[in-house]
């Protein structure tokens, strides 16, 4: 199965030259570290691409990456795994890691499904960055929606049973949406405090209690559960920003953050 890019030329440059130029200009230049997982934003690159590239370029991107993001369209299963084939990117097609996909869908938690992915942007905008940083990367795209904390933990356990030391989990999430900059910074700070504390329960309680529209809170919770099972004790915030710094509109912003979950 071949997934044609849905937002190429809209959320990120269509041409490989422009995409490469953007990525190369925003590389962190920091020494590469080994990570269990990273959290990257997924808005248009003009708004959140700097944060995504800055964070991803600090990490050694292995050949196997599991991408987990929110399902914005409502199509498909609650946990939808793209099973096989490849995804179009400006740098050539990114192959699906069908072996890992099969291991995930062998569980009752996950469903082999393409409907959830056809028009979903949350993972697509990240794939070109990964493909540029490691041309040999193979991806397992997973979207999710409406999961309880218990299901997130169960998914974390599944990931721990499937992933080896050469697998990176990438969480796709923006932070709070469409409030003023002050409110967004306050809400984002509270959610990020839970993320950095590696506390998936606190993240769920905080997001719900403070009405924080962090669209990737569910995959973030699953990743935190996974990382703790793999022995993670440190999460690092690489950058926290919002769309107002680009648009000039501080009355209605979206927050973005990059996080590295260290081995």
Language model: regions and residue ranges:
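Active-site histidine-anchored catalytic micro-motif
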Residues: 1-234, 238-243, 247, 262
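A short catalytic or substrate-binding loop motif that flags glycine-/basic-rich loops and adjacent residues
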Residues: 250-253
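Short beta-strand scaffold segments in enzyme catalytic cores
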Residues: 256-261
């Amino acid at each position: 199965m071949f997934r044609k890019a849905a937002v190429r030329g809209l959320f990120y440059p269509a041409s490989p030259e422009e995409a490469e130029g953007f990525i190369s200009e925003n590389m962190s230049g920091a020494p590469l570290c080994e990570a269990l997982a990273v959290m990257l934003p997924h808005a248009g690159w003009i708004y959140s691409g700097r944060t995504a590239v800055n964070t991803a370029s600090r990490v050694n991107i292995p050949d196997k990456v599991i991408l987990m993001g929110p399902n914005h369209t409502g199509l498909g299963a609650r946990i939808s795994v793209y099973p096989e084939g490849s995804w179009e990117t400006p740098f050539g097609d990114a192959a699906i890691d069908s072996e890992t996909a099969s291991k995930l869908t062998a569980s009752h938690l996950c469903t082999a499904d393409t409907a959830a992915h056809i028009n979903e942007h949350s993972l697509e905008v990240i794939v070109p960055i990964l493909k540029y940083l490691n041309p040999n990367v193979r991806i397992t795209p997973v979207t999710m929606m409406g999961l309880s904390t218990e299901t997130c933990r169960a998914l974390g356990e599944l990931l721990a049973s499937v992933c080896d030391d050469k697998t990176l989990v990438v969480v796709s999430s923006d932070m709070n949406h469409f409030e003023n900059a002050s409110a967004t910074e306050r809400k984002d700070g509270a959610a990020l405090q839970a993320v950095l504390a590696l506390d998936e329960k606190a993240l769920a309680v905080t997001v719900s209690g403070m009405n924080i529209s962090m669209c990737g809170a569910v995959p973030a919770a699953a990743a935190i559960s996974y990382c703790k099972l793999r022995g993670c004790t440190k999460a690092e915030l690489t950058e926290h920003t919002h769309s107002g710094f680009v648009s000039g509109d501080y009355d209605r912003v979206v927050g973005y953050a990059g996080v590295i979950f260290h081995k």
